[in-house]
Each structure stands twice: as C-alpha cells, then as structure tokens.
Amino acid sequence: MQKMESDESMHIIDIREDYEVQTGMLKGAEHIPMQTIPDHMHTFRQNEPYYIICAHGVRSEKVTGYLRDHDFEAYNVTGGMAAF
C-alpha cells in the first residue's frame, strides 16, 4: 500500500463489475471487469507494475495471480475499495 500512496505514475486496474464502479473508482484507475481480463492481455506491458483492485481484495488476488502466471508484474490491493 505504501507505493500506492506515492505520487508515482502507476497502472491501477479496477476489476469490479459495471454496477460496482458506479459508486466510484480511484482517481486514474482503469476499469476492466474481471471476466474480460483475458481479452485485454494484449494491452498490458511487460516490466510495468499493475495494481489490481476489487471490492474487498479477493477477486483482485485471483487476477493478480493470473497476471503473474503470464509474467506480468502485478500486485493485489489488499482490502480493495473497502479499505479506502
């Protein structure tokens, strides 16, 4: 979480469903629903960190693992949006 609080440019991917993001998103986050991540793999770049967020951190943990399995640098935002 410390890195997320810095001013560094970063890729935050909000994987919540459409109805969930209607309540708000983190500034600068990109919305890619969890089920569509495989369809968006071509948009991810190697050697760049991605911070994956969902409502509570459970779904984002799964997506983080999926991205890591495909050799991407990915981090789960523990606690998800509920932590904010």
Can you say where each PLM-predicted feature lies in the sequence?
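Rhodanese-like catalytic fold shared by cysteine-dependent sulfurtransferases
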Residues: 1-11, 17-49, 58-84
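Short, surface-exposed ligand- or partner-binding patches at beta-edge/loop junctions that are enriched
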Residues: 53
